[in-house]
Each structure stands twice: as C-alpha cells, then as structure tokens.
C-alpha cells in the first residue's frame, strides 16, 4: 500500500511539474477564415504541435491579414502561420519574427507566353499586356513583377498589367487577350496540364524566379525569447510528426514534400525588394486591403 502511494505520489508530482512548465498559446493562420476551417484544415497540426511542445495551443481565427497584425500587436495571438508577403508587412507593423520556415517544394514563379507570340525574352514584354494573380500574392504578383525588374522592365510603368484569377489569366493568354501571364509556376502547370486538347508546345516560359522564401511560423514580439526558442526546437526536433499534421488535409497539399527549417528575418529581404519594385517601398500596409 505504501509502495502504491509512493508511486502515485511521484506520478502526480511529475505530472504537476510538467503542467507547471506548460504554456497556453494562441495560434492563427492568415489565409484561413473561420474557426471551423481552422479546426478542419489545421487541427492535426495543432495536435502535433501540442504533442511536440507539451504546451497547449488554442486557435485564434482572423478574417484578414490586417486582423492578424492587429492581434499580434494587441498580444491576443502569439504564433501565426503566414506567407512571405504577409510576413514582411506584419514584421514592419509588429516586430514579429520568423522561427520556422515551411519549405515548399518548387515554390517559384514564372513568366509565360504563347509560343507563337514572337515574344522570346522578358525585354520583349515592354509595352505589352500582362496578367498577374491576386493583388499582394507573393508568387502570383510580387514575384513575377520582381522577375520583370530583374530583367530591366519596370513592372509599374513599362507594362499594361491586370490582376485576375489564375484560371482566367490562363484562358486570356490562350485566347491572345493578354501577351503574358505571371504566376506561381507549379500552380500554372497544374492548370496547363489539364489542357489535353492543346499541343505540348503551345506555351513557353521565358523566365522564372529562384526559389522563393518560405512560408513561416512567426512569433509575436511579446513572447519571451526562451519560450519561442523552446517551441522552435520542439518543431525542428519533431518535424516528421509536425509535417504529417500540416499535410493531413488536402487544402494543404501545396506543402506535400516540405521541410521545416530554422529561419531568420534576413531571408525575406528579397520579398522587401519585390514590394519596392511593385511600387510599395514602405511595405507597411497590405497591398489590396
């Protein structure tokens, strides 16, 4: 009886000590609106995160990028999953910093034209009409504009630009209503590969970017550095289970084949250059909001 009591006491003491060291954090995802979608699409990730850290994570739903920034600034959310373009603005507004990069395979953009267009180089696009994706998107707007700038074309003044959905841009290029499109390369290829009635060489990519900076998990400036480092280490040390949690739902298929890596703010300087070349040199507000 005494042995049982002793074992029970030790178990209780360990559990109490573990619980005393555990924290409760609030977690947001910038491109997922509503608690129901958060639970469905990111619930397995939250569970894996809790298992890896021993902490509790509570979802905090945000309905916009601005709301995520305000929540970080108001210290009502602690960790945020976001993309590179969003991070650059949120960092400027709140001093939040990245702790883990969500390395996506084949995450780059491309400039695409029709093969029969007579357009062979990026310089040939001066004065032409180009379709870009959603305003403010890293890979569908900012990145292709940066590619133009890298080749000496001012994306603000040297081209006639429109913004539309990827599918509409693809149809417009196919019909000759635009001269080129700038898009996330992998996403456009999935649309292109569905066009089984078109010959293989109907389109051509005349330029592509390098691999883009990662999506990331960022931490609010109010979170103690040692606590942020603890979460970072737990994620990296348990990356297999964390990745399995992220990719459990089909809405996160873009992360299939991903890696989790430690990352620093300087990795996003290229995105800051994108903002500047797109005509937003202050990067202190979200484009399109």
Model-derived features: where do they sit?
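Sec/Tat signal peptide C-region and signal peptidase I cleavage site
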Residues: 16-22
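An extracytoplasmic/periplasmic, membrane-proximal ligand-sensing/linker region
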Residues: 23-28, 33-44, 223-289
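Bilobed "Venus flytrap"/periplasmic-binding protein-like clamshell domains
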Residues: 23-50, 85, 108-171, 253-257
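Pocket-lining segment of extracytoplasmic ligand-binding domains
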Residues: 117, 129-227
């Amino acid at each position: 009886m005494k042995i049982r009591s002793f074992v029970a006491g030790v178990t209780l003491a360990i559990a109490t000590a573990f619980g005393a060291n555990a924290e409760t954090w609030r977690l947001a995802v910038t491109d997922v609106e509503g608690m129901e979608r958060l639970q469905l699409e990111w619930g397995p990730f939250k569970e894996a995160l809790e298992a890896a850290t021993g902490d509790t994570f509570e979802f905090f739903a945000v309905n916009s990028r601005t709301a995520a920034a305000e929540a970080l600034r108001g210290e009502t959310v602690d960790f945020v999953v976001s993309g590179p373009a969003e991070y650059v603005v949120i960092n400027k507004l709140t001093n939040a910093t990245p702790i883990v990069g969500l390395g996506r395979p084949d995450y780059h953009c491309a400039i695409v034209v029709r093969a029969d267009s007579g357009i062979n180089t990026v310089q040939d696009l001066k004065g032409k009409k180009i379709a870009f994706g959603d305003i403010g998107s890293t890979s569908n707007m900012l990145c292709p504009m940066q590619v133009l700038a890298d080749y000496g074309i001012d994306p603000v003044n040297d081209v006639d630009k429109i913004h539309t959905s990827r599918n509409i841009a693809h149809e417009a290029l196919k019909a000759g209503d635009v001269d080129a499109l700038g898009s996330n390369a992998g996403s456009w290829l999935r649309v292109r590969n569905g066009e089984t009635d078109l010959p293989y060489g109907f389109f051509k990519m005349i330029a592509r970017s390098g691999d883009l900076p990662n999506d990331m998990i960022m931490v609010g400036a109010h979170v103690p550095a040692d606590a942020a480092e603890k979460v970072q280490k737990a994620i990296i040390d348990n990356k297999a289970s964390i990745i399995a949690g992220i990719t459990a739902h089909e809405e996160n298929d873009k992360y299939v084949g991903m890696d989790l890596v430690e990352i620093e703010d300087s990795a996003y300087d290229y995105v800051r250059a994108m903002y500047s070349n797109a005509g937003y040199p202050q990067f202190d507000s979200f484009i399109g909001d």
